[in-house]
């Protein structure tokens, strides 16, 4: 991944959000420090945000930076009942721009000060920057989305995301630092079963889900992967992964 070249093609805007701490069906609350995501994963459901934000750019080619996120959170957190916060639902909170803007880190500092529990969902080893801060939380967990063990498959579906090996290494480092960790194998892609042995001793649990959207149908067809789009594939992989995780003694949950 050539991050410098990717950023040259990125439309980045500074925006002022109206709110930052939102109710969520996945957790009690969700915080999205950014609109859009540099990873540009072909299957990402969050591309629906284009409809609500007026972006005409291709998904993965725009990011709005919520410059007032910290001020908003400091005000809103005083008015809300304590609950678990999911960071994030429609962006990767540790996408490359986070290295510069540090919105996610500053958000974590506010949540930690007020003793709010947090769940982070990312594909980026940049989260290691905040390992010490996360270890100080009373209740924090970090989840990595890893959909395949095969780098060739990863490049097809997640062209600008960090390599699988970097994610596995980051999970291991966080787990060793005492941070609760999980991996979300979702959507299940070809060669996902190769992840199980790599995750032994590195995660507290694994979540497994199928492809639930059709944004990436053209990718499957372009690369001759139609076999991996149907129910038979997902059901077979579900059982294969479940059996392998059970053998390795890894706690897991099937989401389909």
Write out the residue ranges for each language-model feature.
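Structural preference for beta-strand elements that scaffold enzyme active sites
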Residues: 84-86, 117-119, 139-143, 180-184, ...
């Amino acid at each position: 991944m050539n991050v410098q070249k990717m950023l040259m093609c990125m439309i980045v805007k500074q925006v002022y959000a109206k709110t930052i701490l939102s109710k969520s069906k996945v957790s009690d609350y969700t915080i999205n420090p950014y609109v859009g995501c540099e990873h540009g994963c072909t299957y990402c459901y969050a591309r629906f945000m284009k409809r609500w934000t007026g972006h005409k750019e291709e998904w993965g080619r725009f990011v709005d930076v919520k410059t007032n996120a910290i001020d908003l959170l400091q005000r809103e957190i005083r008015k809300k009942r304590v609950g678990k916060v999911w960071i994030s639902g429609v962006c990767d909170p540790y996408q490359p721009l986070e290295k510069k803007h540090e919105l996610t880190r500053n958000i974590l500092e506010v949540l930690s000060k007020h003793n709010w529990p947090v769940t982070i969902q990312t594909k980026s080893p940049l989260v290691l920057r905040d390992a010490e801060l996360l270890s100080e939380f009373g209740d924090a967990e970090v989840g990595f989305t890893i959909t395949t063990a095969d780098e060739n498959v990863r490049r097809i579906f997640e062209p600008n995301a960090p390599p699988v090996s970097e994610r596995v290494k980051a999970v291991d480092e966080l787990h060793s630092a005492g941070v609760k960790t999980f991996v979300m194998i979702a959507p299940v892609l070809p060669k996902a079963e190769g992840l199980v042995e790599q995750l032994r001793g590195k995660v507290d649990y694994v979540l497994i889900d199928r492809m639930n959207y059709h944004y990436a149908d053209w990718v499957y067809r372009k690369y001759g992967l139609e076999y991996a789009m149907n129910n038979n594939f997902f059901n077979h992989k579900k059982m294969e992964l479940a059996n392998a995780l059970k053998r390795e003694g890894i706690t897991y949950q099937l989401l389909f």
